[in-house]
Amino acid sequence: ANAPLRAADGPTPPGDPQKWPGTGPAWDGEHFQNRRNPFWSERQKDQGAVVWFGDSITEGWRTLDRDFPQLKTANRGISGDCSRGLLFRLKEDVLDLKPTGLVLLIGINDLASGAQPTDVAHNIRRIVDGFRAARPGVPIIVCHIMPWKAQPGEHTQRIKQTNALIDALMLGRPKVKICDTFGAFALPDGTAPKDLFPDLLHPNDAGRVVWRNTLAPVMYELGMLKDGAHL
């Protein structure tokens, strides 16, 4: 039986985001707390879920239960969040659920705010380390930062650099796999396809089908899905 969760009125207030773990930009806001309050009330219901953890790209995936009927899922995406925000809320929003898997996508808001690729990649490493320490042997999927904008430029190189650093930091870790959600979407010049990213940042429903189909074989390889071909 699950031990009762810590009695409290709600999630830990964010305080000064500059004091959060990690390096690089950090912020909270009204939406941050408005999302975290329901997360708190859903803690018992979501025990043992596979948790999707990230920013608005994750928050917008509102059909996880339908798209992954084999799994109990929990969406812990917050629009506008950065990697330091995920470090701050890792315990209460994810680890307290005793999750059976993690699907992590974060970093575009960091890069858009001037973060260095090394900051983002090392914050992601800290998220993975924190999850692994609390949940030994539980599978982790780290998604590549997706393409952004219609014109290639410095931002394209920073995304590619960050993804390469993530690959290097995750290499050889047991039960940790990369999901190439950059390569699955990017046009040859590294930009976002407008048919799947109408605002050139967030995937639409058709884009989420591609994301699901890119995740599925990785989840199958990790034993999270029993059949990688038929969700």
Region spans (language model):
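N-terminal secretory targeting modules
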Residues: 1-53, 58-68, 133, 172, ...
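Acidic/histidine-rich helix-loop elements
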Residues: 18-27, 69-84, 112, 200
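Oxyanion-hole/transition-state-stabilizing segment in secreted/luminal serine hydrolases
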Residues: 53, 58-74, 83-125, 130, ...
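Short, glycine/acidic-enriched loop or turn micro-motifs at the edges of active sites
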Residues: 58, 80, 183
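Charged, glycine-enriched surface loops/patches
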Residues: 121-143, 161-176
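Catalytic His-Asp segment of secreted/periplasmic serine-dependent ester chemistry enzymes
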Residues: 147-231
